[in-house]
């Protein structure tokens, strides 16, 4: 009997510190905002940082220890996570990688900066060293109990959860 090794699974976390003065300057420049004026969807409170990245990272390390690498994707920012990982998960420090938008937008630099999470998530496949199977987190998503690879993948395919809903007119059939 052939011994098949389970595929490696990585985690990718999208993160931004919306209170970073340099980020705010870039946003104002590209969104052509006047100081203290917001566009719908670009309100300051939407990007406030409450250390979500640290909760997210610790939850992954604690409840999904089988994940091989964790990539934190950001735009010229430092999430300052290494001291926390060193303190609580010292053997995992080398598994945490900060990835700048410049890396994933290589060849598409003219589209930077971008503040659009859809654009960013569409470029994650360009992360160097990323496994074919990975779990994508926003920094405000946390794992709250132990998981295993089959929580996310079965037969090398992603597990989808939720309910299929019929359009209202089909419910009467």
Positions of PLM-derived features:
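Active-site-proximal specificity loops/subdomain of glycosyltransferases
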Residues: 38-44, 48, 80-130
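Short loop/turn segments at strand-loop or loop-helix junctions that form parts
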Residues: 10-19, 24-25, 101
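Short beta-strand/loop segment that forms part of the nucleotide-sugar
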Residues: 68-77
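A solvent-exposed, charged loop/short amphipathic helix patch at secondary-structure junctions
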Residues: 18-46, 162
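Conserved donor-nucleotide/metal-binding helix-loop-beta segment in metal-dependent transferases, i.e.
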Residues: 144-173
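Short catalytic/ligand-binding loop motif for oxyanion handling, primarily in non-cytosolic enzymes
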Residues: 19-23, 78-83, 106-107, 142-146, ...
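Short, acidic, metal-binding catalytic loop of nucleotide-sugar glycosyltransferases
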Residues: 59-67
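Short beta-strand-to-loop acidic/aromatic patch adjacent to the donor-nucleotide binding site
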Residues: 131-144
């Amino acid at each position: 009997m052939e011994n098949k090794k389970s595929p490696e699974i990585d985690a990718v976390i999208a993160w931004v510190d919306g209170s970073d003065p340099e980020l705010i300057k870039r946003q104002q420049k590209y969104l052509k905002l006047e100081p203290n004026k917001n566009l719908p969807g670009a309100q300051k409170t939407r990007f406030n940082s409450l250390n979500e990245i640290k909760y997210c990272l610790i939850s992954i390390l604690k409840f999904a220890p089988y994940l091989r690498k964790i990539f934190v994707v950001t735009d010229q920012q430092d999430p300052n996570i290494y001291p926390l990982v060193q303190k609580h998960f010292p053997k995992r420090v080398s598994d945490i990688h900060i990835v700048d938008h410049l890396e994933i937008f290589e060849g598409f630099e003219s589209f930077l900066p971008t503040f659009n999470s859809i654009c960013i998530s569409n470029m994650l496949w360009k992360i160097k060293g990323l496994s074919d199977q990975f779990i994508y987190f926003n920094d405000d998503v946390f794992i709250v109990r132990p998981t295993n690879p089959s929580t996310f993948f079965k037969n090398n395919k992603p597990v989808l959860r939720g309910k299929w809903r019929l359009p209202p007119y089909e419910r009467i059939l």
